[in-house]
């Protein structure tokens, strides 16, 4: 092959790879653009220009394929229940105590729960994400078939959000999954649940802890948080009947009275009519069993993972007082 031919081939391959990393000419993109124009009155030329700038990211596709929730509990738990994160949580709670108490008064959600959510999500705002949200949602919406429908819906919500809030969609940063700000709200959550908690005339969950705190509390309240009620209880079992209750469902469906028919009971005393879900967490050897009540289910509405919700609960418990090595030891 002549040098000139090789050069042309290399340039062609490079150009092809660049074009393949963009999506503006994709038929699905053009359908999406058409829908946004028809449904929401967007300008076609502006959307096409935006997509010309958007990039499909292999890094994002790799990141979403290996979430922390894929780890077993005994490996997942130490990521969040460790001294440094607990210390930072106590500092955050103390620094924003008045705002957190105001949020509790208005929404009924304890300060330590709000703090723990923010601690798990962004290490108290220290790691809110450096990905362009538009790139994340374009990548996952058009190039991740497993959850493409969901991320296309979030892309729609993101474009509506940036128009409503007068944001430049090219400058908004977030996680590899398109979650944004101190509390890591996805676009639909921002539009539905974010609040201007300090009443300064704008909602800013990136730089304003008050709005982040109020938004988390509002999210929990709107999803059914029960003020003053327990989140979980340790479970004890007799026989093997309990095993048929262990599945991937998260919502409590059986009362404690009904659970007792399967040999399941709470270690601590609770009202027999309370509904609970039996949960299993993998240890290095064996498992530990818990009962998740309505408030536990509410936490899973923030992230649909039983491990995530337990990490939030245990981090909140630690922030509220217990030391890291005292928070429900794995070998109990």
Descriptions of predicted regions:
Residues 78-215, 221:
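Acidic/His-rich structured neighborhood in mature extracellular/periplasmic domains
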């Amino acid at each position: 092959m002549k040098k000139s031919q090789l050069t042309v081939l290399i340039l062609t391959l490079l150009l092809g790879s660049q074009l393949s990393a963009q999506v503006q000419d994709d038929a699905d993109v053009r359908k999406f653009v058409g829908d946004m124009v028809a449904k929401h009155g967007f300008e076609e030329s502006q959307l096409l220009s935006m997509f010309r700038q958007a990039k499909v990211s292999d890094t994002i596709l790799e990141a979403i394929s290996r979430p922390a929730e894929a780890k077993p509990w005994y490996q997942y738990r130490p990521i969040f229940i460790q001294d440094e994160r607990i210390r930072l949580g106590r500092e955050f709670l103390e620094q924003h105590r008045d705002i957190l108490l105001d949020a509790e008064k208005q929404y009924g959600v304890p300060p330590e729960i709000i703090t723990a959510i923010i601690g798990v999500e962004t290490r108290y705002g220290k790691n809110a994400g450096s990905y362009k949200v538009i790139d994340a949602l374009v990548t996952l919406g058009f190039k991740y078939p497993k959850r493409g429908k969901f991320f296309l819906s979030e892309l729609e919500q993101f474009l509506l959000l940036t128009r409503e809030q007068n944001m430049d969609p090219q400058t908004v940063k977030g996680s590899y999954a398109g979650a944004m700000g101190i509390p890591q709200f996805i676009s639909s959550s921002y539009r539905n649940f974010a609040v201007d908690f300090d009443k300064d005339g704008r909602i800013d969950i990136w730089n304003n802890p008050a709005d982040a705190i109020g938004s988390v509390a509002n999210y929990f309240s709107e999803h059914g948080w029960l003020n003053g009620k327990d989140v979980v209880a340790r479970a004890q079992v007799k026989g093997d009947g309990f095993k048929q209750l262990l599945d991937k469902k998260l919502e409590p469906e059986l009362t404690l009275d009904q659970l007792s028919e399967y040999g399941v009971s709470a270690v601590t005393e609770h009202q027999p009519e309370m509904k609970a879900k039996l949960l299993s967490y993998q240890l290095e050897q064996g498992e530990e069993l818990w009962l998740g009540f309505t408030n536990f289910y509410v936490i899973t509405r923030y992230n649909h993972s039983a491990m995530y919700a337990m990490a939030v609960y245990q981090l909140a418990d630690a922030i509220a007082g217990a030391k890291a090595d005292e928070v429900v030891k794995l070998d109990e």
